[in-house]
Regions:
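Soluble catalytic regions of membrane-associated enzymes that act on cell-envelope
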Residues: 405, 434-518
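Membrane-embedded helix bundles of polyisoprenyl
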Residues: 125-143, 149-192, 196-232, 244-267, ...
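Contiguous transmembrane helix-bundle modules in multi-pass membrane proteins
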Residues: 214, 328-334, 347-470
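Periplasmic/ER-lumenal interhelical loops and adjacent helix-loop junctions
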Residues: 50, 54-59, 90-98, 243-358, ...
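Membrane-interface micro-motifs in multi-pass membrane enzymes
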Residues: 83-86, 119-132, 155-185, 209-218, ...
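Transmembrane alpha-helical segments
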Residues: 133-141, 180-192, 220-228, 310-311, ...
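Start-transfer (signal-anchor) and selected internal transmembrane alpha helices
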Residues: 1-35
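Membrane-interface coil-to-helix junctions
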Residues: 23-133, 156-168, 172-177, 271, ...
């Protein structure tokens, strides 16, 4: 019996992982092609080149030799583990990455001591984070009782969302949030429905240990999710409210204790960081009517399917527990997005940044998946009353917008196909119907990703040749600095040099400078 159970679960895991790898390859296909053929680096020309890759190289060089956490080369000298805790220094996934790189360096496959190695690692790690995101999200929707078809569609909508690319491209360490959120919710649900608390403890401990800012974001959304599940019970819950209260709080305390090193390091780094807002910068209350902030077309930070609108307006489906939950979350995020103060709150009450869009990506994806799952409970008239106005507005936007977004057309096609399925009860041809829906959803996401790439990724891309330019990593300057370092070996010796572009030149050229950029 146990052997049969293990075999079935292990088999399912490998199948899900295999599908996740395929979806990830599709998701990153254009970026893989651009990197191999054109040498286009999957990292932002700003923070990616100036911070992400130099920080990774610096951390690897110090962690591989188990050097002291205080190092003279970190600015004017400092605790690099604490100083880079906002980025990668406390990420267990990055530690595993460093271990693999060390093995490769030992056997002579890799040369991570030069900045030219790290663009390849940047792309590979982004894909690994995406694979983990797909796998964890599938298991989350499974425990939320999504049917297999709805699970697949919702997982594709989230895993192939623009946020996955945008986060991994711009601030790659933020890619960890994309799987930590569903993992934390999965942990809660496993306890509520199966009385198993282990995954929740691990997920919260990982979050607290990895990044204090992650803990801040996650505390808001997981806290709200937990309160909702505590107040409103679900039919498959097997623990009482009292048990939910006592056990989850106890598990959270255990998570805090097990992550105390990372949490203390992150909190102390946060407290020592001057986050005081520039008094000359005024944060407007209302969000500007700008394409950057659009949700359903041409969005810079995120673009989601117009199916979300129809799902939100289908109030009859709010009788389903998780449909109502994800609809409420989506409504709150939409309403909150109208104010820049909402963006500021998710960035430590400093300059407004849309760091919360990954939550919207998950809630809207779950909502769309559940809408398709419960579609057959609606009648045709009810569906059309909500769909036709959305389609008309979408068509008008396509015609009047200078970008003529193709993603809206694909979204309209999806709504029409759903109408045909509802009208003719095509769920009896389940395999064909599901295959068509999955194909259309994938096409929609690919089109959305392509549009977002042209808008939010391409303008900030650089090629491998940038790594050899005079203002980033010049061979002449490199040789000159090597000579200086040979004659000045003391830790108090400093080189006062920083290029206009490579602001973290001391990390890139391996010398003790007088500053660092973060």
């Amino acid at each position: 019996m146990l052997k049969k159970w293990l075999n079935s679960n292990v088999k399912q895991f490998f199948v899900i992982t295999f599908i996740s790898v395929i979806l990830t390859l599709i998701l990153f296909s254009t970026h893989i092609y651009d990197y191999i053929v054109n040498g286009t680096v999957f990292s932002g020309a700003g923070d990616g080149f100036r911070q992400m890759m130099p920080f990774q190289m610096y951390l690897y060089e110090h962690l591989r030799s188990f050097s002291s956490l205080y190092d003279a080369s970190f600015g004017l000298g400092g605790d690099y583990m604490k100083g880079l805790s906002y980025y990668y220094s406390l990420s267990p996934l990055m530690w595993l990455n460093f271990l693999f790189i060390k093995i490769g360096e030992t056997v002579g496959i890799f040369n991570p001591t030069t900045i030219h190695f790290w663009p390849t690692n940047q792309l590979i790690m982004a894909m690994i984070r995406a694979i983990i995101t797909f796998v964890v999200t599938f298991y989350l929707f499974k425990i939320l009782h999504f049917k297999r078809s709805a699970n697949m569609i919702a997982t594709i909508l989230y895993g192939m969302s623009t946020v996955v690319i945008y986060f991994n491209f711009t601030w790659s360490f933020y890619g960890n949030l994309l799987y930590l959120l569903p993992l934390s919710i999965l942990g809660l649900e496993r306890y509520f429905q199966q009385r198993k608390i282990g995954i929740f403890i691990v997920a919260i401990a990982l979050t607290l240990f990895s990044n204090f800012y992650f803990s801040y974001y996650q505390a808001i959304i997981i806290g709200c999710y937990y309160l909702y599940r505590l107040i409103f019970t679900y039919k498959y819950d097997i623990v009482s409210r009292t048990q939910k209260l006592i056990c989850v709080i106890s598990a959270t305390v255990l998570s805090v204790l097990s992550s105390v090193f990372g949490l203390f390091t992150g909190i102390s780094a946060f407290l020592e960081n001057d986050r005081k807002q520039n008094p000359n910068v005024d944060i407007p209350f209302l969000t500007p009517l700008d394409y950057h902030y659009f949700f359903f077309s041409d969005g810079f930070y995120i673009t989601i399917s117009i199916l979300t609108i129809v799902a939100l307006l289908s109030f009859k489906l709010y009788r389903f527990y998780f449909y109502r939950l994800f609809a409420i979350v989506t409504w709150i995020l939409f309403i909150g997005s109208l104010s820049q103060y909402f963006d500021s709150a998710f960035n430590g009450f400093s300059f407004p940044e849309r760091r919360w869009v990954y939550i919207l990506a998950l809630s809207s994806s779950a909502l769309c998946g559940l809408f398709i799952q419960h579609l057959s409970t609606l009648n045709m008239k009810y569906y059309l009353i909500r769909t036709i106005p959305v389609c008309i507005i979408a068509i008008l936007y396509v015609l009047l917008s200078p970008t003529h977004p193709l993603a809206l057309i694909v979204g309209i096609i999806l709504l029409i196909v759903l109408a045909v399925i509802l009208k003719f009860s095509l769920w009896r041809y389940k395999k064909l119907t599901v295959a068509i829906l999955v194909l259309i959803v994938m096409i929609q996401q690919i089109v959305i990703l392509d549009n977002n790439k042209n808008m939010a990724i391409k303008p900030y891309q650089q090629s491998l040749s940038t790594l050899k330019q005079h203002d980033y990593h010049s061979n002449y300057v490199n040789q000159l600095i090597k000579k200086i370092n040979q004659n000045a070996t003391g830790s108090f010796n400093r080189i006062d040099y920083m290029s206009d572009y490579a602001l973290n030149s001391p990390f890139i050229y391996h010398y003790n400078g007088i500053s660092l950029y973060s």
